[in-house]
Swiss-Prot record:
It is found in: Cytoplasm; Nucleus. GO terms for biological process: cell differentiation; gonadal mesoderm development; nucleosome assembly; spermatogenesis. PANTHER family: TESTIS-SPECIFIC Y-ENCODED PROTEIN (PTHR11875). This is Testis-specific Y-encoded protein 8. It comes from Homo sapiens (Human). The gene is TSPY8. InterPro entries: NAP-like_sf, NAP_family. GO terms for molecular function: chromatin binding; histone binding.
Amino acid sequence: MRPEGSLTYWVPERLRQGFCGVGRAAQALVCASAKEGTAFRMEAVQEGAAGVESEQAALGEEAVLLLDDIMAEVEVVAEEEGLVERREEAQRAQQAVPGPGPMTPESALEELLAVQVELEPVNAQARKAFSRQREKMERRRKPHLDRRGAVIQSVPGFWANVIANHPQMSALITDEDEDMLSYMVSLEVEEEKHPVHLCKIMLFFRSNPYFQNKVITKEYLVNITEYRASHSTPIEWYLDYEVEAYRRRHHNSSLNFFNWFSDHNFAGSNKIAEILCKDLWRNPLQYYKRMKPPEEGTETSGDSQLLS
């Protein structure tokens, strides 16, 4: 019979079998007791190779996520126990003071300090839970993003089409920009939350007559109100285009895609970064325009109708 106040977790039989691929089956028991603190015990026994290999990776990932949840629950229980103990100590201290009286400013500040002390572990617990949940969701999103990227590789000019058809971006793109974007083969966005919130935009290009770079990376520090330029890969223009690039950058001082692309600190360029990170990257397909195939018996022309 388990002690009162304890939490016991058993790894399901299906997950234990999932570890056969590495030669071990794991059975996890986590027990958090209000009297004896938190204890975590992992018992592993050697088992022979069994199961279907194609399921092992998925089972292993599921086991990792389950153990993450278990550890998160253990931390929550431990922190709650500590908070209960601190509250009980504060109550005993208050009971030791003879006679309740009107609260003076000094006593009010002491009470406020005690409440703030109690609040700190709750805030820390919330931050840990949020961070762990975000990391878990990122792990689950990654295989889908990888698959999406592989599929997009089979659609020529996908990202150029998407960027040019975005309602805000379309006003910032010239014909020369569209030609440059036609050499773009992939777009990737990565976000880091710690130690600072950072958004990294990576644009991948095939060989083109404009610049030598295969990958151009732009990084932005993100806060509540804006995206602030942090770092950008220097563009290695070909000599045949370097003069033209200089002319374009200084001839037009308004915000456009080329100025954002070539000058990381160009005024207002953070707006383009925000569109790429928060809108285009999350659902690019909504801005992709497909060419409508001609109907049978009709003559084809250069002006094909677009499908949203």
